C-alpha cells in the first residue's frame, strides 16, 4: 500500500464519525482532501461544513458541499484534520500547509477532534518536523530572536502569506518534551498569532492508515 493509499484509507474511515444533519469542521492537507472526497458522497445527509482554509473551501464548493462561515455556526460535532506529527498523548504539530491559526480556531469550537494520518506521522517525541509559527509581519525578526532563546532555529518561509495576511517562521531543532508548556511559551511572545503545537487541544480520536489497514486510537 502506497503512502497516498494509506492517507485515503484514513480519510474515508473518518466518515463514520460524521453525524447526520450536522455541520462538519474540515481541515487542510493531502489526507483531508481524501476525507473531502468521502464527505461528498454523503453531502445530502449533512447540513454542510466549516473550513479551515481557502484551499479546502474551494474543493468542497467544487464538490457541492455547502460551506459556512464559522461565526454563523453554534455547534460543530466533529473536526477532521491531519497532522505533520502526532505522539502517543495525541499532541500534534500542524501547520505545514500554513493554515494553523484557522485550524486551531475550528478545533477549539468542535466537540471532537478526529486526526487522520498515515503511519509516517506517528512519533515518540515531537520536533523533527519544524514547528510552524504564524507571525505578524512587522514582528518577524523580534519573534525569531525570541525563538532562538527557546532553543530553536527559526527559518522564514519565504513567499508564503497565510490566509490571514501573516508570515510563517518554521522552527527547527526543537526536541519538544513538554508540548503544552512550549505551546504557551511561544504564544506569549508579542507578535505571534499562534504556533503549530496542538497540545492544549489535542486529538480525541486518531485514525492511522497503515499497510494493514486503518488503526484507531482514542485519547486516554
UniProtKB/Swiss-Prot annotation:
Q: What's in the keyword line of the UniProt record?
A: Isomerase
Looking at the UniProt record for this protein, which Gene Ontology cellular component terms does it annotate, in alphabetical order?
cytosol
Residues annotated to bind substrate: 28-31, 81-84, 94-97, 121
Q: Name one Pfam family in it.
A: Rib_5-P_isom_A
Provide a GO biological process annotation: D-ribose metabolic process
Give the annotated active site. 103 (proton acceptor)
This entry's Gene Ontology molecular function terms read: ribose-5-phosphate isomerase activity
Catalysed reaction(s)? aldehydo-D-ribose 5-phosphate = D-ribulose 5-phosphate
Superkingdom is: Bacteria
The pathway it acts in is: Carbohydrate degradation; pentose phosphate pathway; D-ribose 5-phosphate from D-ribulose 5-phosphate (non-oxidative stage): step 1/1
Tell me which EC number(s) this protein carries.
Answer: 5.3.1.6
CDD domains given in the database record = RPI_A
Q: What does this protein do?
A: Catalyzes the reversible conversion of ribose-5-phosphate to ribulose 5-phosphate.
Q: Which family does it belong to?
A: Belongs to the ribose 5-phosphate isomerase family.
Subunit structure, as described in the record: Homodimer.
User: What is the name of the protein in this document?
Assistant: Ribose-5-phosphate isomerase A
Q: Which organism is it from?
A: Shewanella baltica (strain OS185)
